[in-house]
């Protein structure tokens, strides 16, 4: 079974700190603010994710192919953090973190009271607050609540070290 080790920030830590400045965009790097974690490494700061549902994209090295995989870490309402791959578990589509509830209604025909993960290719919707079965029978966050999705997104273990959020490993 794969469990994520999200932790809450300490009460002594400031509520927010300025986000890191992004380097100027170049034609070769359309998303310059994304950090690449090739092993356990920082992908965001506690200050960048100071509010519930705040998210930060990053790239994580696939343990099998060594290719960079688009990923995201989100602060949940219980002050824990959840990391997940934005690559569809059994396909080629890139998942999206949908914080705009109107977009969930219009693009996915799904009504929710909090952000979800969506698959724009098959209109599957994944709930960040619910657990679903993984391919090995364990439970992972991101239950499929609508559509043809086979399993939740691949989890990325994250932990807090001081003011940094560290991506540790992919499921």
Identify what each model region corresponds to.
Residues 2-113, 125-134, 139-146, 150-171:
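N-terminal pre-ligand scaffold of iron-sulfur
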Residues 114-121:
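Cysteine-rich micro-motifs
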């Amino acid at each position: 079974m794969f469990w994520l080790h999200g932790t809450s920030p300490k009460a002594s830590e400031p509520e927010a700190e300025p986000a890191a400045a992004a380097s100027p965009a170049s034609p070769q790097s359309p998303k310059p603010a994304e950090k690449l974690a090739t092993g356990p490494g920082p992908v965001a700061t506690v200050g960048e994710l100071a509010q519930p549902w705040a998210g930060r994209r990053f790239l994580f090295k696939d343990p099998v192919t060594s290719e960079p995989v688009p990923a995201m870490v989100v602060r949940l309402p219980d002050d824990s953090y959840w990391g997940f791959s934005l690559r569809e578990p059994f396909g080629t589509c890139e998942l999206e973190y949908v914080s705009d509830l109107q977009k969930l209604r219009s693009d996915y025909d799904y009504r929710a009271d909090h952000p979800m993960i969506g698959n724009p290719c098959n209109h599957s919707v994944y709930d960040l607050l619910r657990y679903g079965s993984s391919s090995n029978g364990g439970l992972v966050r991101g239950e499929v609540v609508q559509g043809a999705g086979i399993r939740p997104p691949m989890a990325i273990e994250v932990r807090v070290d001081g003011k940094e959020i560290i991506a540790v490993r992919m499921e």
